[in-house]
Curated annotation (Swiss-Prot):
InterPro entries: aa-tRNA-synth_I_CS, aa-tRNA-synth_Ia, Anticodon_Ile_BEm, Ile-tRNA-ligase, Ile-tRNA-ligase_type1, Ile-tRNA_ligase, M/V/L/I-tRNA-synth_anticd-bd, Rossmann-like_a/b/a_fold. This is Isoleucine--tRNA ligase. The keyword Iron-sulfur does not apply. Keywords: Aminoacyl-tRNA synthetase, ATP-binding, Cytoplasm, Ligase, Metal-binding, Nucleotide-binding, Protein biosynthesis, Zinc. It is found in: Cytoplasm.
């Protein structure tokens, strides 16, 4: 037997089968930074339209987790895709560097500021710690393949940024949005500080739920108002009961609130009268285990306004007041009101000029002058409050109650609502809420439900407490009058003076400032504010401190992209401060992604053992697998990740890599400038392949523009596996391997492969950037050193509508091929044939389909990958033929059988002319021509 292997054009490439990503990616990464790829890309796009994605700063504490990886990869995909669109896309990463978590880490090592270490040294240690965390996170983000200005990130602790945060505060003060007040705020006793809304998490908690009698001091007045005819005056006891799950707040009670428009009834039982909301009588009396009662009077809540009640255990009268916040969701329809311990209570208390009493210290302990409970922690005092109520005869009912309660995000402990002197951004004083609601409507929200979510949050939120009683942060650099508490009338000028000093020396410039340096003789009248700003203010004003400041950026940014929890966090703090500065949103578009969960939908946690660390994935599978998983996930919902899911992603990656390798291997010996065939001269099947890529590129680009990356993954994967792997690449192997090296048949095919590869490498580049770079290096022809410097490939072209071998033609051929393959599979299962080339097929077709298939002539067999394929009229179909159904009358009948002809050892086709040539007795006539003659001519496939 002769060996004809040397006569075949076998595939050959240096592109390895295995990605070995964990080893190769760091090497490629080093190359990117040695050649300043990001800088070159910026220079390449200079002067082009700009697209600005503003990076929401992660917190500079701890290793990056899978959520960080998702966020940064999504941003990087968008930036690289927009760059492919031809935009100038600067990416300036940032970090949030102030705040409590860093303070707590430093406290563990150095002790508390002002105790074991000076405040200055403490802040220095915080700065040093934050810088070390930034360095660690930066390397991991770079390792993910995220391209950006990593040498010049923005840090909220940079001196200039700290100064600009102050300037932004000054602008917001100037517009009248900042107020000072003694108001209830979320307070963590463990932190010793107020908390922002975004720092509050809701967890299940069991609390004592109690119904408490507030005795009516003037029963005759109740008789008169409710028309009771003396029932109240005659009763032994008359009360309005409240229901609460926070007994510890009762010492601060100042009133009982009713809804003005609700109907209330007076219920009589035994020798007692109770006033209850009509809708809640049944549930309340069931709670009190009273079956035998009667309704003796009715009135609206408004009628009872001003009725005097007795505090259940303090020597204090409290009034009945009216509030729209009272509901009938539960309880009694009467709400215990402590303005020092709740936002609704505070608001209604202001209307009635009630005292805002707060008997609780910052550590959660009752103040020394608190009757009955002095020195006790509020939560530990709950049982004692209940006992005292029972002792005084004020307790109607008591039971444990499981409910959702706010907890500190850091300590995971229940928080307090506690009135303290704080600085606030007022939502309504100067129209901020109104302007914010208007600005929201001008933003493009992805997904669309994001708009309704942030609208409801902004519409319902209280004023924003921006002050914190901590050490590590940007100071609220105000001087306030010692007597009135009012800010200095020249605060705007003074803030700028402080900002200039902070720009030189950091926040210590304020903390160590002698007021006389700026105020002169006025220093005696004023004192420095020692509070610092909420870190959400720091990150919220990056539209002013970063976007406005850096020449390559702009405000509004085109896109903010973060997790869906940021509707109540960064998206909102950015919106409010931007409205406070310039009355517009800081972003044109907002994109949110869901959280990561495991395969079963469970939240990631160390205790469950289901945490997927991005560092481990990169060190084993490679960053491109992580990037492909992100792209393949529908990030608008929760994103499931596990070792099993990543393994399946790696399998999909291998299929795409193998497709790329096949393309590259079959471009061996092809130089586009020399060998590329003009579109009109290409074989119809090759033009079809380019057309498929052309159509796909349109869809891919549209999906990138709509941020639908999972669709890109599905489409490109499907193209590789079905269009290419399942059809085109299978069909062209014969032509590619067996025809003459420089024949039109082969060069046409290589031209198609080249066009497809040029498109594919760019579609993949934003997603699996490392692999795309590797493909790029192995493509033939002159090219830049990085695919990331490129724009979308413009060499793809569509099929002409008038082409007899147009899209409709190939759709029908593919349908025929699918029907033939099903029958061949049956023959294979029946052990009649092995490979499809062992088969011969006869197709009996209706006239229209026959006319189409006849266009391919003898080359139909190459499309079907059978040794023979004949097309005949449907009427001639033998009874043993099989019906193959089709759409629109395109069904046909098929007869398939094993070929009886000998096999050509070179092309493996079974042909009647094998052995007809004395010099090549093992070859078919076609192969003889390709080896020794002029070579075969292909017209179609």
């Amino acid at each position: 037997m002769s060996d004809y292997k040397h006569t075949l054009n076998l595939p050959k490439t240096g592109f390895p089968m295995r990605g070995n990503l964990a080893k190769r990616e760091p090497e490629r990464l080093a190359g990117w930074y040695q050649t300043d790829l990001y800088g070159r890309l910026r220079r390449e796009r200079a002067g082009k339209p700009r697209f600005v994605l503003h990076d929401g700063p992660p917190y500079a504490n701890g290793d990056i987790h899978i959520g960080h990886a998702v966020n940064k990869i999504l941003k990087d995909i968008i930036i690289k895709a927009r760059s492919m669109d031809g935009y100038d896309v600067p990416y300036v990463p940032g970090w949030d560097c102030h705040g409590l978590p860093i303070e707590l880490m430093v406290e563990k090592k150095r002790g508390k500021a002002g105790a074991k270490v000076s405040p200055r040294a403490f802040r220095d240690a915080c700065r040093e710690f934050a810088a070390s965390q930034v360095d660690g996170q930066r390397e991991d983000f770079k390792r993910l393949g995220v391209l950006g200005d990593w040498d010049n990130p923005y840090l909220t602790m940079d001196y200039r940024t700290e100064a600009d945060i102050l300037r932004a505060l000054g602008r917001i003060i100037q517009r009248g949005h900042v107020t000072r007040g003694f108001k209830p705020v979320h307070w963590c006793a463990d932190c010793g500080s107020a908390l922002a809304e975004a720092e509050v998490e809701y967890e299940e908690k069991t609390s004592p739920a109690i119904d408490v009698r507030f005795a009516v001091l003037e029963p005759e007045e109740l008789d008169r108002r409710a028309g009771l005819g003396g029932e109240a005056a005659a009763a032994g006891r008359v009360a309005i009961p409240i229901w609460t799950t926070t007994p510890w707040t009762l010492p601060a009670n100042q009133a009982v609130a009713l809804h003005p428009e609700l109907e209330y009834v007076v219920v009589a039982f035994d020798d007692e009268l109770l006033v209850l909301a009509a809708e809640l009588v049944e549930s309340a009396m069931a709670r009190y285990e009273v079956d035998d009662y009667r309704v003796v009077g009715r009135c609206d809540g408004a009628v009872l306004e001003g009725l005097r009640l007795a505090h259940p255990f303090l020597e204090r009268e409290v009034p009945v007041i009216l509030g729209g916040h009272v509901t009938t969701d539960g309880g009694t329809g009467a709400v215990h009101t402590a303005p020092g311990h709740g936002q609704d209570d505070y608001v209604v208390g202001q209307q009635y000029d009630l005292p805002t009493d707060n008997p609780v210290d910052g550590n959660g302990v009752f103040l020394p002058d608190t009757p009955f409970f002095a020195g006790q922690h509020v939560f530990k005092a709950n049982p004692k409050v209940v006992d005292l109520l029972a002792e005084r005869g004020a307790l109607l009912h008591h039971e444990p109650y499981r409910h959702s309660y706010p907890h500190c995000w850091r300590h995971k402990t229940p928080i307090l609502f506690r009135a303290t002197p704080q600085w606030f951004i007022s939502l309504d004083k100067a129209g901020m809420r109104e302007h914010a609601m208007a600005a929201i409507k001008g933003v493009s929200w992805h997904p669309e439900w994001g708009q309704a979510r942030i609208e409801s949050m902004v519409n319902g939120r209280p004023d924003w407490c921006i002050s914190r009683q901590r050490n590590w942060g940007v100071p609220i650099a105000l001087f306030v009058d010692k007597r009135s508490g009012e800010p200095h009338p020249e605060s705007e000028r003074l803030i700028e003076a402080v900002a200039r000093r902070v720009e030189e020396a950091g926040v210590d410039a304020w903390f160590e400032l002698d007021p006389a340096e700026l105020l002169g003789a006025d220093a005696e009248r004023y004192e420095k504010v020692t509070d610092i700003l909420d870190v959400w203010f720091d990150s919220g004003v990056t539209h002013a401190t970063v976007l406005e400041r850096r020449d390559e950026l702009q405000v509004p940014a085109d896109l903010y992209l973060e997790g869906s929890d940021q509707h109540r966090g960064w998206f909102q703090s950015s919106l409010l401060t931007s409205v406070g500065v310039r009355e517009t949103a800081p972003y044109k578009g907002v994109l949110t992604h869901g959280f990561t969960v495991d395969e079963k939908g469970h939240k990631m946690s160390k205790s469950r053992g289901n945490v997927v660390a991005p560092q481990k994935v990169m060190d084993t599978l490679g960053a491109d697998i992580l990037r492909l998983w992100v792209a393949s996930s529908d990030y608008s919902a929760e994103m499931a990740v596990s070792d099993g899911i990543l393994k399946r992603t790696a399998d999909a990656y291998r299929r795409m890599r193998n497709t790329a390798r096949f393309l590259l291997a079959n471009l061996n010996g092809f130089e586009p400038a020399e060998h590329a065939v003009a579109p009109p001269d290409m074989l119809p099947l090759d033009r079809w392949a380019v057309d498929r890529a052309y159509l796909l590129q349109q869809q891919v680009r549209e999906a990138y523009e709509r941020y639908e990356f999972h669709r890109i993954y599905q489409m490109v994967h499907n193209f590789c596996v079905v269009d290419l792997g399942g059809f085109y690449l299978d069909v062209i192997k014969d032509r590619q391997y067996t025809t003459k090296p420089d024949s039109l048949a082969r060069r046409s095919c290589q031209t198609a492969l080249w066009h497809v590869a040029e498109g594919l490498v760019r579609w993949l580049a934003p997603i699996i950037s490392f692999t795309a770079e590797e493909i790029w290096e192995h493509l033939p022809g002159e090219r830049s050193d990085s695919v990331l410097l490129e724009t979308w490939y413009e060499g793809l072209f569509p099929l002409d509508d008038s082409d007899p071998f147009g899209r409709a033609f190939w759709d029908d051929v593919l349908a025929v091929r699918a029907g033939v393959n099903r029958e061949l599979e049956q023959l294979r299962n029946d052990k009649v044939i092995g490979a499809s080339l062992q088969a011969e097929v006869q197709l009996f077709c209706p006239p229209e389909l026959k006319a189409k298939l006849d266009r391919l002539g003898d080359e139909l067999r190459f499309v079907l990958i059978t040794s023979e394929a004949r097309v005949e009229d449907l009427e001639r179909a033998p009874v043993e033929s099989v019906e193959v159904p089709g759409e629109n009358g395109q069904g046909f009948r098929l007869f398939a059988a094993a070929s009886q002809h000998p096999k050509c050892t070179r092309c493996w086709h079974h042909r009647p002319d094998v052995g007809h040539h004395a010099d090549h007795p093992e070859l078919c006539g076609r192969c003889v021509s390709n080896v020794d003659g002029e070579g075969e001519t292909r017209h179609y496939a």
